[in-house]
Amino acid sequence: ATYKVRLLSEAEGIDVTIDCADDVYILDAAEE
């Protein structure tokens, strides 16, 4: 399965949606 993960930080001006497979650590996916 693949999940859509939204990273939101108003203070940092970040609003990103990433695809994250269920066998990948979310921090590893966020680094890519």
From Swiss-Prot:
Residues 3-32 form the 2Fe-2S ferredoxin-type domain. Its cofactor is [2Fe-2S] cluster. Binds 1 [2Fe-2S] cluster. GO terms for cellular component: chloroplast. Signal peptide: none annotated. It is found in: Plastid, Chloroplast. One of its GO terms (molecular function) is metal ion binding. Keywords: 2Fe-2S, Chloroplast, Electron transport, Iron, Iron-sulfur, Metal-binding, Plastid, Transport. Its main location: plastid. It comes from the Eukaryota. Ferredoxins are iron-sulfur proteins that transfer electrons in a wide variety of metabolic reactions. Belongs to the 2Fe2S plant-type ferredoxin family. This is Ferredoxin. The lineage of its organism: Eukaryota, Rhodophyta, Bangiophyceae, Porphyridiales, Porphyridiaceae.
